[in-house]
Amino acid sequence: MADETTMRAGRGPGRACGRVSGVRILVVEDEPKMTALLARALTEEGHTVDTVADGRHAVAAVDGGDYDAVVLDVMLPGIDGFEVCARLRRQRVWTPVLMLTARGAVTDRIAGLDGGADDYLTKPFNLDELFARLRALSRRGPIPRPPTLEAGDLRLDPSEHRVWRADTEIRLSHKEFTLLEALIRRPGIVHTRAQLLERCWDAAYEARSNIVDVYIRYLRDKIDRPFGVTSLETIRGAGYRLRKDGGRHALPR
């Protein structure tokens, strides 16, 4: 894809202004021609550029370096760009990430952005557009850490995929976490089964499926019953609601 990108990298009279100088950028790309193209072009723009060719080295470099932005290819040997970005966010590294990939499907873009990427550029691309996006990321600076979501003493950390009840950490599966996150983002609001199915499952599950009820039960077994509380309420004929106060304690018998 490097040749195609070069062909679209013309710098005409309409080139954008507002260069941000002195920016340190890490380029994570395993294709040598593309790496050389990006490193040369970014250096000519006045940036300091480092390069690595695989996901593991990318995580180590960003975690140990002081970068202003990362240009991250998705298709990498070892661990891919999606996982690289997710690991960085779990490690509380908030350096802006621009995903760079030949995969232009909407689902791929969503996966990258949901995983913590700040922007997404599909190959083949125009270098001037890349520069403009990096300028925007540099002006924005490091993204703030996503807030911990809370309902009473129940806490969910979206960036680290961790959940606690008071001081006790609770282990959830990926789907349990996704369902709880949908509920805790709007505590006190009734969510219909259809809404939860749409947000947390793919189109393979039909509206009449009882998969939502099954996972609500799984969640209750982990976040409620061991602590003697009821936070997940069934609203008959409507759906489910997570209490804003994190759950009422069961009355002693």
Swiss-Prot record:
GO cellular component: cytosol; plasma membrane; protein-DNA complex
Keywords: Cytoplasm, DNA-binding, Phosphoprotein, Transcription, Transcription regulation, Two-component regulatory system
SMART domains: REC (SM00448), Trans_reg_C (SM00862)
Modified positions (4-aspartylphosphate) in chain numbering: D73
Gene Ontology molecular function: phosphorelay response regulator activity; transcription cis-regulatory region binding
Recorded superkingdom: Bacteria
DNA-binding region of this protein: 146-244
TM region positions: none
A GO BP annotation: negative regulation of phosphorelay signal transduction system
PTM info: Phosphorylated by HK2.
Location(s) in or outside the cell: Cytoplasm
Location, primary (coarse class): cytoplasm
Other notes: Was identified as a high-confidence drug target.
Subunit: Interacts with HK2.
The protein, known as: Transcriptional regulatory protein TcrA
Lineage, broadest ranks: Bacteria, Bacillati, Actinomycetota, Actinomycetes, Mycobacteriales
